[in-house]
């Protein structure tokens, strides 16, 4: 089953069961045994790491993907974008290192909306972002990821974290509760 058939309607995920794994053009498929080094990105890996975004519950997901051939990785992402673009989803490599890529799968329209709120714009401007468009902000984020070893903390805004929580984390405030992320303002 391909990702294109997993998605339906307004982006809802239906029965996320991957029964086949796509391989890169070179023919190298993802290693399927637990603990085996993955040699390529697969649709299964995308579904496992990005189900909340594919289901329309989040703006974006981020995951690391080992790879052996850069061109195969980029070909796979182009193919994925041809299929997912129809559903309003896009995948981009934010950082590519020697044998590992950091992939961001997101909903561009939702990212545009998320980053256009006043509190997001103010927070991002502190880090040199010009938030007149999600693609510009993504370009700046990718540049920051390449320039520094640590993750830029504003990345939470690209992953559907509330701006108040990202700001609270940056200011080292005491959190009110911990779940999938630390909550600093509204616990609900």
Predicted regions and their residues:
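Accessory, usually C-terminal, subdomains that scaffold auxiliary metal cofactors
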Residues: 176-188
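A structured, charge-rich N-terminal accessory region that forms the first stable segment of a protein
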Residues: 27, 33-97
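Hydrophobic/aromatic-rich, well-ordered segments within soluble, folded domains that form packed cores
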Residues: 151-176
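Short, surface-exposed beta-edge/turn micro-motifs
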Residues: 58-60, 99-101, 152-154
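Gram-positive cell-envelope targeting signals
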Residues: 1-31
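A glycine-rich, hydrophobic loop/mini-helix early in the fold
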Residues: 75-133
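Helix-hairpin-helix/helix-loop-helix acidic hairpins
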Residues: 133-149
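Short, surface-exposed acidic
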Residues: 130-135, 163, 178
